[in-house]
Amino acid sequence: MSTPGAPEYSAFFGVIGASAAMVFSALGAAYGTAKSGTGIAAMSVMRPELIMKSIIPVVMAGIIAIYGLVVAVLIANSLTEDISLFKSFLQLGAGLSVGLSGLAAGFAIGIVGDAGVRGTAQQPRLFVGMILILIFAEVLGLYGLIVALILSTK
């Protein structure tokens, strides 16, 4: 895919794609972890026996960062000095795809996890509903990962 006549700056867009994949997905994971962790801390004062059961949103938020890491490593390993502008733009699109969808998924997981953990402490039957909603929020990040893998392997 490399082109000998590629502009000198073409690799820049691939590097930005790798950076965007990691930065935005890590921001989403950090927000999801912090927001869910706050709910767990508040809930555990009254119901400490539910702490381990309530850790699921934090784990799911952490998985979002792994999606970004996978794409960032794929992009970084395929960067060369003479990469074509087309390939570099594909890498930028892949990084933005997984990064921004990871940011959105992290926000959703954090908000749902916080409310779900607090609600489950009051009414244990809400646990299954919380898990289902968390799965739908996690899938948002997975969609971005799928699109990013398609783009980065072209």
From Swiss-Prot:
Topology Cytoplasmic: residue spans: 33-54, 114-125
Protein name: V-type proton ATPase 16 kDa proteolipid subunit c
Membrane-crossing residue ranges in chain numbering: 10-32, 55-75, 92-113, 126-151
Topology in the lipid bilayer: Multi-pass membrane protein
PANTHER family: V-TYPE PROTON ATPASE PROTEOLIPID SUBUNIT
Family designation: Belongs to the V-ATPase proteolipid subunit family.
Compartments in which it is found: Vacuole membrane
Domain of life: Eukaryota
GO molecular function: proton-transporting ATPase activity, rotational mechanism
CDD domains: ATP-synt_Vo_c_ATP6C_rpt1, ATP-synt_Vo_c_ATP6C_rpt2
Keywords: Hydrogen ion transport, Ion transport, Membrane, Transmembrane, Transmembrane helix, Transport, Vacuole
Primary subcellular site in the record, as a coarse category: membrane
Lumenal face of the membrane: 1-9, 76-91, 152-154
Post-translational note: The N-terminus is blocked.
Keyword Transmembrane helix attached: yes
Residues of the site described as Essential for proton translocation: E138
GO CC terms: proton-transporting V-type ATPase, V0 domain; vacuolar membrane
Source organism per UniProt: Torpedo marmorata
Job of this protein: Proton-conducting pore forming subunit of the V0 complex of vacuolar(H+)-ATPase (V-ATPase), a multisubunit enzyme composed of a peripheral complex (V1) that hydrolyzes ATP and a membrane integral complex (V0) that translocates protons. V-ATPase is responsible for acidifying and maintaining the pH of intracellular compartments and in some cell types, is targeted to the plasma membrane, where it is responsible for acidifying the extracellular environment.
Lineage start: Eukaryota, Metazoa, Chordata, Craniata, Vertebrata
Subunit structure: V-ATPase is a heteromultimeric enzyme made up of two complexes: the ATP-hydrolytic V1 complex and the proton translocation V0 complex. The V1 complex consists of three catalytic AB heterodimers that form a heterohexamer, three peripheral stalks each consisting of EG heterodimers, one central rotor including subunits D and F, and the regulatory subunits C and H. The proton translocation complex V0 consists of the proton transport subunit a, a ring of proteolipid subunits c9c'', rotary subunit d, subunits e and f, and two accessory subunits.
Entry annotated with the keyword Metal-binding: no
InterPro entries assigned: ATPase_proteolipid_c-like_dom, ATPase_proteolipid_csu, ATPase_proteolipid_su_C_euk, F/V-ATP_Csub_sf
